[in-house]
Amino acid sequence: MERIDGEDIDYFLLQIEEVFNEAADRENDDGEWMIFSGFRIWVPKIFSLADQESASEIFWSEYRPDIMLFTDKKTEGMTLQTLGGMGIIGAGGGHPIESVKQLLETIDDRNVYYDMGVTDGNVKIYWIEYKSFAGEERVYNLLFLFQTEAGDILGTFYCIFEEYEKWKPIAWEMIQSIREEPDEGI
């Protein structure tokens, strides 16, 4: 990754803003919109919903996320979990990712945190980027939180750390596509 100096920062911010704005209204044949309880998300064709067998290969615990999307290699994926009435977003008035970060720090002090923030799109999404470890492997993570009628949703995009430059734009495109999808009781 190339270092930027003070003169380049405005250009860098404009590029990032352009990437986020492009992804917002994505409608093409490279993927599909998937609708879940209270929201929809654009998912590239390379990802598919995991069945129980695939999920158990990645997540050994019985307590798995509600929604799991994997590539065929299963080294890249996105998980989404409804937190229900836990109320992480809006509780305490602070940045909700701060409490998630504190929890992550207690689990593994080897994690390396890069950046965190909040999007200002259709759905307010709080996020944090960090590197974690699975055994000896380094893993890039983009963890995010947003709110729907069903409650708070916790999502994570992960990939092998050495491939994050390839997958990070795809992860952001998926996250930026999240839209509210009111439950019409049908």
Regions found by a protein language model. Name each.
Residues 1-125, 134-138, 148-186:
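N-terminal targeting sequences that direct proteins away from the cytosol to non-cytosolic compartments
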Residues 128:
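Short beta-strand/turn segments that mark the catalytic/cofactor-handling region
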Residues 141-145:
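Extracellular C-type lectin-like domains
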